[in-house]
Regions:
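Outer-membrane beta-barrel initiation region
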Residues: 1-56, 64
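Repeated loop/turn-to-beta-strand initiation elements of outer-membrane beta-barrel proteins
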Residues: 12-22, 58-65, 99-107, 144-154, ...
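Outer-membrane beta-barrel pore domains and translocons
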Residues: 2-8, 23-31, 65-71, 90, ...
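Residues on the lipid-exposed face of transmembrane beta-strands in outer-membrane beta-barrel proteins
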Residues: 3-13, 49-57, 89-95, 135-143, ...
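Outer-membrane beta-barrel "beta-signal"
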Residues: 283-285, 303-319
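Outer-membrane beta-barrel proteins
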Residues: 29-39, 71-79, 114-122, 159-171, ...
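Detector for outer-membrane/organellar transmembrane beta-barrel domains
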Residues: 104-106, 138-249
């Protein structure tokens, strides 16, 4: 969210600058994974954002988002199935400070709280709670003479996923993102660079089941085109790599290192409808191929291959 500071004189004038939107979103995701055991695991997730409200006060350089989502996930493989239903509340807070000469600095905090239940052949109503925290200082720049600029942030994240008798998974990490861009008339060209490092711990009743370090890097070229009818078309293509180092894990997995190749494409279109409405549709396809190192040369080389598709739509009413 980019908010430009405007000087104010009194409370009533500040209140007059209040604006935002309300609306709903829907996302459908399919995953197909051919895993190391030679099995194919299918996963289907429907996410309905029942309500999203965005509020902005430019005079205060402050913005906030609140959303409520229902999430239904179904997993299927030979001899096993799993269903999870969840309700997610989230909030995002953004405070911007204008530095001058085209620079803005922001502090962003995101909090998501997800409460759900899992049903499978082995459990009924297994309670799950996931809490995700993200804190991001951001720095943006735009030069109107060059018609160019950049967006950047660093991030600290912490996530805790509690699956009751199935155990707890905690993730803690940092990331850095830098995205320069240049506009040529209706066209905009950019590229996003990203690096992340996370420490992951899984434990049950105090016993470590898995402890690993995950690092990911990618670059993502971005092309945008703005139509005269207030529509925007964009294409993003990601080329990335990931590495998981298992320092302390179950016996079969101890000290193994996993290497992942990541490819992802995103195509989207956003359209203003009149003065009050904005609609968007977006499609994503991701492909990931992972393999692991072996200590025994007699081990057979195997892969974990993921294909993932997402379709996302939203409609917002602006005020």
């Amino acid at each position: 969210v980019h908010i430009t500071w405007v000087g104010s004189t009194d409370w009533s004038e500040e209140q007059a600058g209040f604006n935002g939107h309300v609306g709903t979103t829907f996302e459908y995701e399919t995953k197909s994974t051919d895993n190391y055991l030679g099995k194919t695991v299918k996963e289907y997730t429907k996410t309905h954002e029942i309500f999203q409200a965005y509020f902005s006060q430019p005079n205060w350089q402050f913005a906030a988002i609140y959303g409520l989502k229902s999430i239904d996930r179904r997993q299927e493989e030979k001899g096993y199935h799993e269903n999870e239903t969840s309700l997610q509340n989230y909030i995002s807070l953004n405070k911007t400070f204008t530095i001058g000469n085209g620079f803005d600095f922001s502090l962003v905090y995101d909090l998501m709280y997800t409460d759900g239940n899992i049903d499978s052949p082995y459990v009924t109503g297994l309670h799950t709670v996931t809490v995700d925290n993200s804190f991001r200082p951001t720095l943006t720049y735009f030069n109107s003479d060059w018609n160019a600029g950049f967006y950047s942030n660093v991030e600290y994240l912490y996530s805790r996923n509690d699956k009751s008798s199935w155990g707890v998974r905690e993730e803690e990490g940092q990331s850095i993102l830098f995205q320069p861009y240049k506009r040529f008339g209706a066209w905009e060209f950019g590229i996003e660079f990203f690096y992340q490092k996370k420490h992951n711990d899984e434990f049950n009743h105090g016993k470590i089941n898995d402890r690993s370090i995950y690092t990911e890097t990618y670059y993502e070229p971005i092309i945008k085109y703005a139509f005269e009818n207030a529509g925007n078309l964009y294409l993003r293509t990601r080329f990335g790599h990931g590495k998981t180092e298992n320092a302390d894990s179950l016996q079969y997995n101890a000290n193994r290192t996993y290497f992942k190749t990541i490819r992802k494409a995103t195509l989207g279109y956003e359209q203003n409808i009149g003065d009050d409405w904005i609609a968007k549709i977006e499609y994503k396809h991701a492909w990931e191929k992972e393999h692991k190192n072996f200590y025994d040369p007699r081990d057979e080389e195997k892969y974990n291959v993921l294909n993932q598709d997402n379709i996302y739509v939203h409609a917002f009413y602006r005020f």
